[in-house]
Amino acid sequence: MSNALYLMLDIKKRLTNIKTCDTLSSTNQYMEVSIMKKVKIGSIIVKILEVFHWVGTVLMAAATVCSMAAPQWVGYFVGFDAKECCGANLTVYGFEVTAPVTNGNADMTTFFLFGIGATVILGLMAMVFRNLSLIFKRSENNTPFQKDNVRMMKEIGIFSIAVPVVGFVMSVIARIVIGAEAAEISINQSGIFMGIIVLCLTQFFAYGTELEKDVDGLL
């Protein structure tokens, strides 16, 4: 009788352990699926932003060229809703230039300088979102601690810092060429801070990559 009781208790304990393991396994699978869905959604959003920025880069480059080839058409389009007293306010990611407006047409020299800076800035931001998209894609079915991901994160930090620097340089050039009223010399500190933070995170990713390499070597 005693042996039968012990046997029943042992069977019950084993069944409980199996049930617990199944529950933990189901929980882990649910968490993995949830993480994968979030990574997939993030990848789609970043890809859309990348495409928008590449389109913006191409359009801005075309408008910059047209400002010299067909200045009257571009000048009317830019100064369509602007007042002569205030000028046309042109801005992108902290880089801001005010183009004088005369008879409804914006000054094309100002727009040309703005277009050069805006094209470079939009191209840099497109590269930021491109790298983010690749990082998401590489991490869908693999660990994020990869050598290529570390390199791309470092590039993101550099591009983020380069955006306000380009805006600052073009603002200085605009003031020299056009005048002090055309552009305000300032630098977008948020872009620099974001770039520095990303570069710091890159060091953690590099350390994680080395640790994962050591673990794989032990296995």
Residue ranges and their predicted role:
Residues 108-137, 203:
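Transmembrane alpha-helical segments in integral membrane proteins
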Residues 58-75, 126-129, 169-179:
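Transmembrane helix-loop junctions and nearby membrane-interface residues
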Residues 40-43, 59-113:
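Interfacial loop at the N-terminal end of multi-pass membrane proteins
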